[in-house]
């Protein structure tokens, strides 16, 4: 799915020739990864989404007055290591690890997804943001804001609390990740030499997802 999105934090749509950012959504099933993605790209809240389905989406935005083309992989909510998971761990340039503030287990599982990234990339210096979703369900909160902030500080990454249902802070989370990627790109020894190889891995992964969808129809 490809949608051009005029994001709220940086008005205006991106022009041609935008830098492409390969983003991977991680987190336990049911935390709202797909709802966040759909709200970001199309300002729509899905009535239903199968948490076992992995899919890819594309959108263009402007972030800090620079065009950005986001290629977003919305993953299934299992923290097991698989061959396909290894592909998107290698191909992704940045990761959004999501949990639900109403589900303490999903918060605890965030560490498993962080470790999966390390198993493949062998470094913790990967662009990453931590997101606590479903803050519209405050009466059911099990994870405090302070706990989320503390974990983000441990990971040395950005932290956002969001509501996909209300489209609260959704743009901020995606924009924050792109800023982290751009920050890493300013250090060529860490990022620049790896971009071509990641692009090849990403294309291979997208082809695998397409075949899976075709087999399901």
UniProtKB/Swiss-Prot annotation:
One of its GO terms (biological process) is regulation of endocytosis. Pfam families: Ras. InterPro entries: P-loop_NTPase (IPR027417), Small_GTP-bd (IPR005225), Small_GTPase (IPR001806), Small_GTPase_Ras-type (IPR020849). Its EC number is 3.6.5.2. It catalyses: GTP + H2O = GDP + phosphate + H(+). CDD domains: Rit_Rin_Ric. Keywords: Calmodulin-binding, Cell membrane, GTP-binding, Hydrolase, Membrane, Nucleotide-binding, Nucleus. It is an enzyme of class 3 (hydrolase). Gene3D superfamilies: P-loop containing nucleotide triphosphate hydrolases. It comes from the Eukaryota. GTP binds at residues 27-34, 74-78, 133-136. Neuron-specific. Interacts with AFDN, the C-terminal domain of RALGDS and RLF, but not with RIN1 and PIK3CA. RLF binds exclusively to the active GTP-bound form. Binds calmodulin. Interacts with PLXNB3. Interacts with POU4F1 (via N-terminus); the interaction controls POU4F1 transactivation activity on some neuronal target genes. NCBIfam families: small_GTP. Belongs to the small GTPase superfamily. Ras family. Binds and exchanges GTP and GDP. Binds and modulates the activation of POU4F1 as gene expression regulator. This is GTP-binding protein Rit2. It comes from Homo sapiens (Human). The gene is RIT2.
């Amino acid at each position: 799915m490809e949608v051009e999105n005029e994001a709220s934090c940086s008005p205006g749509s991106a022009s041609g020739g935008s830098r492409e950012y390969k983003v991977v959504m991680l987190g336990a099933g049911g935390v709202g990864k797909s709802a966040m993605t759909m709200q970001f790209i199309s300002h729509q809240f899905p009535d239903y989404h199968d948490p076992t389905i992995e899919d890819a989406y594309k959108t263009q935005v402007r972030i800090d007055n620079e065009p950005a083309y986001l290629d977003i992989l919305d993953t299934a909510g299992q923290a097991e290591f698989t061959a396909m998971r290894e592909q998107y761990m290698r191909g992704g340039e940045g990761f959004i690890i999501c949990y639900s503030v109403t589900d303490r287990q999903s918060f605890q599982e965030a560490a498993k997804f962080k470790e999966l990234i390390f198993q493949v990339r062998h470094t913790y210096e990967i662009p990453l943001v931590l997101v606590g979703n479903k803050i519209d369900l405050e009466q059911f909160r099990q994870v405090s804001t302070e706990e989320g902030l503390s974990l983000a500080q441990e990971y040395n990454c950005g932290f956002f609390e969001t509501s996909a249902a209300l489209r609260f802070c959704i743009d901020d989370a995606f924009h924050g990740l792109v800023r982290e990627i751009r920050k890493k790109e300013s250090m060529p020894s860490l990022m620049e030499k790896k971009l071509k190889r990641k692009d090849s891995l990403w294309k291979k992964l997208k082809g695998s997802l397409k075949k899976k969808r075709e087999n399901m129809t």
